[in-house]
């Protein structure tokens, strides 16, 4: 449903760009809905549909063995390369319940340079102090990480939880900017919008609002639609060599569930 909706909206909104992870989803669509799959391939070739995420599925990382995690990257990246000619560079895990300290090393050896999530904001007791930082693994490997701060909350003391299901409207965009912890380091943040966790994707209302916000609304940050990998490339250039770029060593433990 989400993929078919996206293809329809792309016909109506030429500036609209979309990203989806999880090779397994594409494999299902290829087998069951070949006409949708061909439409996806056309949009990828046109530079409007981004395939990223690197893993076969958005995998658990707490109880999963190291070999299984390696195979998630191996099989996932191979599928995206063979089917679409894309070499993934982002580990995209917006809704996974904690992140093993072994991941930075595995990611780097798999050719992954960047990490994204929002779930860690669900901590029950301690707010993770950073949204943009270097994540240091067990062996010392470091990965540039960014937690999407999208939220409709404006009270900085209470804005713990963020969402990957943001509405593309001034409330969520401005709320995310208030919530973003590294404004002294970087002047942009990544906002993922649309109906997820059940599917549906973005709506016409969101795209109409996004079109207007691209032009600028007084008192609200401007938005632009671009691929996640482009955001990370710009982020890396912005923070590279900065002494203000914080580091987090070890496991990213989720204090919830």
Task: Locate predicted features.
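Catalytic-domain carbohydrate-binding cleft regions of carbohydrate-active enzymes
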Residues: 1-257
């Amino acid at each position: 449903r989400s993929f078919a909706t996206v293809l329809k909206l792309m016909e109506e909104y030429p500036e609209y760009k979309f990203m989806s992870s999880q090779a397994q989803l594409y494999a299902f669509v290829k087998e069951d809905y070949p006409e949708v799959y061909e439409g996806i391939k056309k949009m990828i070739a046109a530079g409007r549909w981004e395939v990223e995420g690197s893993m076969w599925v958005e995998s658990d990382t707490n109880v999963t063995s190291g070999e299984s995690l390696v195979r998630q990257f191996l099989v996932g990246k191979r599928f995206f390369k063979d089917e679409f000619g894309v070499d993934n560079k982002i580990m995209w895990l917006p809704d996974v319940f904690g992140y093993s300290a072994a991941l930075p090393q595995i990611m780097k050896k798999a050719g992954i340079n960047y990490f994204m999530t929002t779930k860690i904001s669900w901590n029950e007791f301690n707010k993770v102090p950073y949204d943009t930082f270097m994540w240091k693994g067990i062996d010392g490997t470091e990965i540039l990480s960014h937690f999407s701060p999208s939220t409709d909350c404006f009270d900085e003391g209470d804005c713990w939880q963020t969402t990957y299901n943001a509405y593309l409207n001034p409330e969520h965009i401005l709320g995310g900017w208030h919530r973003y912890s590294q404004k002294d380091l970087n002047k942009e943040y990544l906002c993922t919008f649309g109906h997820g966790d059940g599917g549906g994707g973005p709506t016409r209302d969101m795209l109409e609002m996004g079109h207007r916000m691209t032009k600028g609304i007084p008192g609200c940050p401007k938005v632009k639609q671009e691929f996640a990998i482009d955001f990370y490339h710009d982020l890396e250039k912005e923070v590279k060599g900065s002494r203000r770029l914080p580091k987090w060593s070890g496991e990213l433990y989720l204090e919830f569930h």
